[in-house]
Structures are given as C-alpha cells and as structure tokens.
Amino acid sequence: FLPKMSTKLRVPYRRGTKDYH
C-alpha cells in the first residue's frame, strides 16, 4: 500500500488537494 494513494483516497481535501485537483 502507498501512503500517497491512501492519503488522497482517505483525505483528498487535506493533502491530495493539489494532487487531486
């Protein structure tokens, strides 16, 4: 499992904001 994928999947509005958008 990757911490980056889990993070954006769990909290896409916290750390995946710049990555998700």
Curated annotation (Swiss-Prot):
The keyword Oxidoreductase does not apply. It comes from the Eukaryota. Minimum inhibitory concentrations (MIC) are the following: E.coli standard strain (MIC=12.5 ug/ml), E.coli drug-resistant strain (MIC=15 ug/ml), S.aureus standard strain (MIC=1.2 ug/ml), S.aureus drug-resistant strain (MIC=5.0 ug/ml), B.dysenteriae standard and drug-resistant strains (MIC=7.5 ug/ml) and C.albicans (MIC=15 ug/ml). Keywords: Antibiotic, Antimicrobial, Cytolysis, Fungicide, Hemolysis, Secreted. The keyword Secreted applies. It is found in: Secreted. GO terms for cellular component: extracellular region. One of its GO terms (biological process) is defense response to fungus. This is Antimicrobial peptide scolopin-1. Antimicrobial peptide against both Gram-positive, -negative and yeast. Also induces histamine release by mast cells and shows moderate hemolytic activities against both human and rabbit red cells. Expressed by the venom gland.
